[in-house]
Each structure stands twice: as C-alpha cells, then as structure tokens.
C-alpha cells in the first residue's frame, strides 16, 4: 500500500501542457519583467546543462511536486477560462521552488531559477509525504537490513560499486541502530539496487545524461535506481572536479537516505538536499560527503541514535573500506509510537536551534496539579489594549508563547511581551511589532531554518520576518493563508519539538505536525498517544535541551521529560518570569 502511495505522489499529470504553456510567457518576460538573482552555490554547478527551456521548467514544477497533480490549472469546462487563478497557482509554485532552492523569491522563471532547475539532482519529489492518522513514519520495522545489486554500472568495476554502496549505508549505520549487509543478486533482499536507462521497468523513466541522476522509494518498498546514462566515478577527484563524471558515493548516500525514510532537506548543505553537490573543493581535492547535522537529526528522529561504533567492511563480495556494520548488537526494546516519530529516547537528540535559556526557576515555587493545569484561570477580560496585564508588567494570562533567535515572546490579548532570559524587557501592542496581525493570537511558532515567525488565529496562519532596518516584523508575501481543511481543529498552541517537527495543538486532545512551506499537515493524532501526561492547554515551549522541555499553559509553567513522559518542576507564569 505504501509503495502505491509513493508512486501516486511522485507521478504527475502533464495532459494540460497546452494550457500550462500559455502561462509560461507571463512569468518569463524576456529578462526585463522580473528581478534577477544569482545561483546560491557554485558547489552545485553542472556545466553540461546550463539552463532549462520555459517548457521544461513548467514540466519540472509538476514533476517535483510544486504543482500538485490535483491542480491541473484548467477550468472545469476544459477551457482556459480561469486564467487568473491558474496564474496565481503557477506563480506560487515558482516561489515555492525558489524558496526551497535558496534563491530570490521573485515568482518569475528568471535566469537564476531556470539555471537552478538545470542542475543535476535526485528524481524524488520535493513535496513532503503526508502521513495518515494513526500511521507511523516511513521506516523499516527492523534494524538489520539487506541489499542486493541487481545490475551494474557500465563505467565502474563491481568492486567500486560495492565499496560505494557499503560506504553509503555505513554512514547511516554509524548514527542509527541500523545494520546493513549485501546479499547476492536474485536473493530476497530488503533493498534492490539497479543501474538502468530511460524506461527501466518502473514508473519513473530516466532522462539521459544530466538532470535526474537516481531515484529511490520510501520504506518498505526498497527500490533504488541509478541512471546509467550518467558518467559515474568512485571518488576520482580529477573527473569530478572537471565535470567529467558524477561521484557515485555522494549520490548513493543521498538515495540511501530515501530508502530509509528521509525526504528532501531545505538545508542546501545537507546530504538530503535534492541537488547534486560536487565532492571536490576549489583546488580539486576530494571532499568526503559526510552526513551533516540536519541529516543526522532527521534520521535519528526516525530510528534513534546508534552506538557510535566505527563501521566495518561488508562480509559479502570482498568490499574493502566499506561502511556497513555486520557486528552483532544487543537486543533493544521496541520503541513507542512517540519515539518512532519524535525521537524521544535519546538525550543527545538536539533541536537544530541554539538553546538560549538556562532554565532559572524561582526560589518560591507555586505548584499546581489536577484540574488547575491549563484551566485558563485569570483569562477573563482579554482583548483590550490593557487587558492581560498585571502589576509589574506581567500578563495575567498568555494566549501564545514562542522563543525566537534573540528573545521569547508572550502574547496576551492585544499585547506582546518581549522576554529576555526570565525578564520582561518590553510590552507593546501586537500591531506595533506585527503590523496587520490578528488579535488575539491563538498560537505562535518560530522557524529557525526559514527565520519565519508564524502567528495563528482562527483558521488562518500569518508569516512574518524580522526587519533589522525597521526593527519590527513584516508579513511575508502570500500571507495570511487559510490553514488546510484536514487540520480539523482550532489551533490553541504551537511548539517546535526537539527534532524540529512543528506541532500545532488543539485545546483538547488533538495535535498535528504542520509544514508552513507547503501549508500541509503531515501527521495527525491524539496528544495523549504521543505525549502521555502532558497537561492540556499547552501554548508553547522554550527551546528544549536534551529530553526536557519547559512548557507554558495560559498561566502556568512546567518541565516535561519527553523520555520518561513525566512532569517535573512547576511554577506560575508570573513567578517564572520574576514579575
């Protein structure tokens, strides 16, 4: 069933090419109608395909998920009647790609955008894979996996191919409990690796030299294919530096990540970024394609951390220098649903943000229990410019709470409180700091990767970025947006979990993992199933350190241990910030 799902999400419709082509000229403009921007990284260069045509750029956006198959950009009667709506979708698709690729978000198919599209890349869609309620992350249900190489490269020896695959899986093995071993072709293996060209007996034909280099499917289907029309090499720095060949090892690490359940990363330095990264420096020296922190956080969020032991060579086929671990491991306890998705079992799983605050609990504690948690006491009279404030500059309640890169922000009624450490440093109108923001704010969320501050109110989301010149937050273009209909509840709290997942919470027992880039829900479930013993009414959390988070309800603060699922120290909000 999962294989069918992956196939469905990767396949796109091109039957409306004629209508779509009529839009292309509106977004190209011959170079004068749109701003220009430069490519973000020379390490992604590929001299064989300098740019894409307008028609291929259109197809690219469909192929890699920026225009969903359900949105055909054609009116109901089959005529190109709703041109304005189609233009909006197309421009949004271009901007999504530009943001994902790290280039200027012009909304036009400018030269920089088409040049980025021309880079060699993975064939897997950039759109996130949605998880249905009650399902687990795309992952293997066991830790010992086998792979077989069913066909071979026309450029490399079998030993070099074996070494590359063994090293690739060895890197993933070093940071997870997973173990990999090669078995002979034709065996019953978990992952089947092939080299093929053009139509090669799967739903996704290759495109010849350049463009798509390889593709793979999510667990537990185990499909892993390289395009044999590429010129492959194994760590040959001269060929790689001169753009004569593509490093098989780098591509194998990336595709191997897909076979383990990883999607594409928006971090352009990560192995799981969709674009091929040359493995040489400016002097032509080979640079080993190691996993980056983003890759490690993502894979450990699914499987947990490994033992840290060095990997050993494969026992099959005589590979030397490989990375697949074949040594025996102690039996481990099956992880909970919570651990499978949120990676709670290890203290060394860290947020990708820097923890700014060392929790400073006040000497005088105000412990609460039972029905007092998240009850919203003291929340009457919200909405006026002065409501929600008590003596000493402290709010009597909070509607939303979030950390950011420099400060934390507590929202109460029509006011926002800037907090440094455990001190309120400024109180001002929400509209002064966030022009055109809703009041009250029901939830707030800071995304350290994009630098966006998300505000939620009713069924809408507002995205802001901080202007260093104006010293206020300014709304991103394209916002506010209506939250996806499948969210199914009113947002009353939001938090960024230890491994980077962005979580929206209801006032009851529902939560959803949310991606604002695609405005999409990727997981829904019950809070009590994933966060046992977490009090109701959580508004936000401080940047977590290890497995312990500091969480805020409307008028309370408490510690929650994500590993033991237990409540620690507790305090009233006004006591916590020493007002």
UniProtKB/Swiss-Prot annotation:
InterPro entries reported in the protein's UniProt record: Hemopexin-like_dom (IPR000585), Hemopexin-like_dom_sf (IPR036375), Hemopexin-like_repeat (IPR018487), M10A_MMP (IPR033739), MetalloPept_cat_dom_sf (IPR024079), Pept_M10_metallopeptidase (IPR001818), Pept_M10A (IPR021190), Peptidase_Metallo (IPR006026)
Q: Where are the Hemopexin repeats?
A: 395-437, 438-490
List, as start-end ranges, the regions of compositional bias called Gly residues. Answer: 315-324, 373-394
For Zn(2+) 2, which residues are the binding ones? 122, 254, 258, 264
Primary site of residence: secreted
The Swiss-Prot or TrEMBL record lists the needed cofactor(s) as: Zn(2+)
Q: Which residues form the propeptide?
A: 18-129
Which residues are recorded as binding Zn(2+) 1?
Answer: 200, 202, 215, 225
| Superkingdom as given in the UniProt entry | Eukaryota
Q: Which GO terms describe its molecular function?
A: metalloendopeptidase activity; metallopeptidase activity; zinc ion binding
Give details on activation and inhibition: Inhibited by human TIMP1 and TIMP2 and the broad MMP inhibitors BB94 (Batimastat) and CT543.
Report the EC number(s), separated by commas if there are several: 3.4.24.-
Carbohydrate-modified residues are: 231
Q: Which residues form the signal peptide?
A: 1-17
Q: Where in the cell is it found?
A: Secreted, Extracellular space, Extracellular matrix
Q: Which family does it belong to?
A: Belongs to the peptidase M10A family.
**What PANTHER family does the annotation carry?**
MATRIX METALLOPROTEINASE, MATRIX METALLOPROTEINASE-C
Q: What is this protein called?
A: Matrix metalloproteinase-C
Q: Which organism is it from?
A: Caenorhabditis elegans
């Amino acid at each position: 069933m999962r294989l069918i799902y992956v196939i469905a999400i990767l396949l796109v419709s091109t039957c409306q090419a004629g209508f779509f082509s009529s839009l292309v000229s509106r977004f190209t403009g011959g170079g004068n109608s749109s701003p220009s921007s430069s490519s973000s990284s020379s390490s992604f260069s590929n001299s064989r395909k300098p740019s894409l045509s307008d028609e291929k750029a259109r197809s690219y956006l469909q192929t890699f998920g920026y225009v969903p198959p359900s949105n055909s950009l054609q009116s109901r009667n089959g005529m190109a009647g709703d041109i304005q709506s189609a233009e909006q979708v197309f421009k949004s698709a271009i901007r999504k790609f530009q943001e994902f690729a790290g280039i200027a978000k012009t909304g036009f198919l400018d030269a920089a955008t088409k040049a980025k599209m021309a880079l060699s890349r993975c064939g897997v869609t950039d759109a996130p894979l949605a998880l249905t309620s009650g399902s687990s992350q795309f992952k293997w249900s066991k830790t010992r996996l086998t792979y077989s190489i069913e066909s071979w490269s026309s450029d490399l020896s079998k030993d070099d191919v074996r070494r590359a695959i063994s090293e690739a899986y060895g890197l993933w093995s070093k940071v997870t409990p997973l173990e990999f071993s090669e078995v002979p072709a034709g065996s019953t293996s978990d992952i089947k690796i092939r080299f093929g060209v053009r139509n090669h007996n799967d739903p996704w034909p290759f495109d010849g030299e350049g463009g798509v280099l390889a593709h793979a499917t999510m667990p537990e289907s185990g499909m892993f294919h390289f395009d044999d029309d590429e010129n492959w090499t194994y760590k040959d720095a001269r060929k790689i530096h001169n753009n004569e060949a593509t490093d098989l090892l780098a591509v194998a690490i990336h595709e191997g990540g897909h076979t383990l359940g990883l999607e594409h990363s928006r971090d352009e330095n990560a192995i799981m970024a969709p674009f091929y990264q040359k493995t040489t420096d400016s002097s032509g020296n080979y640079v080993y394609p190691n996993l980056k922190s983003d890759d490690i956080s993502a894979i450990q969020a699914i499987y947990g951390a490994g033992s840290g032991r060095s990997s050993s060579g494969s026992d099959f086929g005589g590979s030397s220098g490989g990375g697949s671990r074949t040594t025996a491991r102690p039996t481990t306890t099956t992880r909970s649903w919570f651990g499978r998705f949120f990676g709670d079992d290890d203290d060394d799983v860290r947020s990708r943000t820097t923890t700014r605050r060392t929790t400073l609990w006040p000497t005088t504690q105000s412990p609460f229990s039972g029905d007092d948690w998240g009850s919203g006491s003291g929340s009457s009279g919200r909405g006026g410019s002065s409501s929600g404030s008590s003596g000493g500059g402290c709010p009597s309640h909070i509607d939303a709470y979030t950390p950011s890169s420099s400060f934390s922000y507590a929202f109460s009624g029509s006011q926002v409180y800037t907090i440094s450490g455990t001190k309120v440093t400024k109180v001002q109108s929400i509209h002064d700091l966030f022009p055109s923001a809703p009041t009250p704010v029901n939830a707030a969320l800071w995304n350290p990767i994009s630098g966006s501050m998300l505000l939620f109110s009713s069924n809408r989301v507002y995205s802001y970025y901080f202007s260093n010149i104006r010293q206020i937050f300014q709304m991103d273009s394209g916002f506010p947006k209506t939250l996806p209909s499948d969210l199914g509840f009113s947002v009353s709290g939001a938090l960024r979990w230890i491994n980077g997942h962005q979580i929206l919470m209801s006032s009851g027992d529902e939560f959803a993992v949310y991606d604002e880039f695609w405005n999409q829900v990727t997981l829904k479930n019950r809070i009590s199933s994933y966060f046992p013993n977490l009090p109701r009414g959580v508004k936000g959390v401080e940047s977590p350190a290890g497995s312990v988070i500091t969480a805020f309800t409307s008028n309370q603060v408490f510690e929650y241990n994500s590993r033991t699922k237990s409540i620690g120290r507790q305090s009233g909000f006004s006591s916590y910030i020493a007002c």
